[in-house]
A protein has these predicted regions:
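A glycine- and small-aliphatic-rich helix-loop capping segment at beta-alpha/alpha-beta transitions
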Residues: 74-79, 148
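Alpha-helix C-terminal capping segments
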Residues: 52, 69, 73-74, 91, ...
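Glycine-rich N-terminal segment of FAD-binding domains in flavoprotein oxidoreductases
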Residues: 63-64
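Short, contiguous clusters of charged residues that form electrostatic/catalytic patches at enzyme active sites
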Residues: 39-46, 50, 67, 115, ...
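Conserved phosphate- and dinucleotide-binding cores of soluble alpha/beta proteins
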Residues: 11, 86-207
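HTH-adjacent hinge/linker in prokaryotic transcriptional regulators
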Residues: 1-59, 70, 79, 92-96
């Protein structure tokens, strides 16, 4: 719609919400994202990896921050399902049991998306899931520029017993085109508390 294109509405599953933030519909490539806020992402990733116990069945979303988790849990006896080709390759080389979902490969984020991926994910029941996001606000929730990727995230989240969204401080206040989860739908692991979010009970800040 005209309002959506103008950045006045944010698309969510089941409706739309008014936006007082600038919508950023562009999807940065993996090469662009991997050089930004590296130390923050590594600290977040190390903490998140520490939440994984032996014998767990986890979902690992595509993304640079989730990618940094790999070096911190490859010594654990776990099974990982992922829609990220790069994650799957690294896990397999490290000897971790890994399952890569099938579907359409999205070139910019190197993530597998589409109905085939969603159909596969509905068969699984994960103990924990770790997800990336392009933006987060209380009103719009967790957002991403691509509707297909949002649907895969949403499907995987529904199959997780515990859900964690990994995002550095720069993602707060940002809104991308499509909401895949309400703000209160997961625990957030970040490196710095943002003004206006100090009283949120679902945020873990890594010093």
């Amino acid at each position: 719609t005209a309002l959506h294109n103008a950045g006045k509405l944010v698309k969510v599953f089941g409706g739309a919400v008014a936006s007082d933030h600038v919508v950023t519909p562009q999807e940065p490539t993996v090469a662009q994202k991997i050089t930004v806020h590296v130390s923050e992402k590594q600290r977040i990733a190390e903490y998140a990896a520490g939440l994984i116990g032996q014998g767990e069945f986890i979902y690992l979303d595509a993304g640079t921050t989730t990618g940094y988790m790999l070096e911190f849990f490859c010594d654990k006896d776990v099974t990982v399902v992922t829609n990220a080709v790069a994650h799957a390759q690294r896990l397999a080389k490290a000897g971790v049991k890994v399952r890569l979902v099938g579907g359409e490969l999205k070139s910019s984020t190197e993530a597998v998306v589409g109905s085939e991926a969603m159909q596969t994910l509905r068969k699984y029941h994960f103990t924990k899931g770790f997800f990336g996001t392009n933006g987060v606000t209380k009103k719009a929730g967790f957002t991403t520029p691509d509707a297909n990727e949002a649907m895969v995230k949403k499907t995987a989240i529904e199959q997780c017993q515990k859900k964690y969204v990994l995002c550095d401080h720069s993602k707060f206040g940002e809104v991308s085109s499509v909401t895949f989860l309400a703000f209160t739908g997961a625990d957030v692991i970040t490196d710095r508390i943002t003004e206006g979010y100090q009283d949120c009970g679902n945020i873990v800040v890594i010093e």
